[in-house]
């Protein structure tokens, strides 16, 4: 029973890390798409839009990193 629980923990950690990476990729893709649409509509606001896009993408990457760290902690602790 203990060996089965350990393997399920490994599977769960791997699935969790994968889902976090996939979700971050989708989120950053949507941010990039929306930013390009906004820049096409308002070219004079390019610098503000680009800055906001980079900040939001960094926040998403931070959340994804925390999710992967939690999955790794679940795997090894």
Predicted regions, residues:
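Hydrophobic, small-residue-rich transmembrane alpha-helices and their short perimembrane loops
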Residues: 1-77
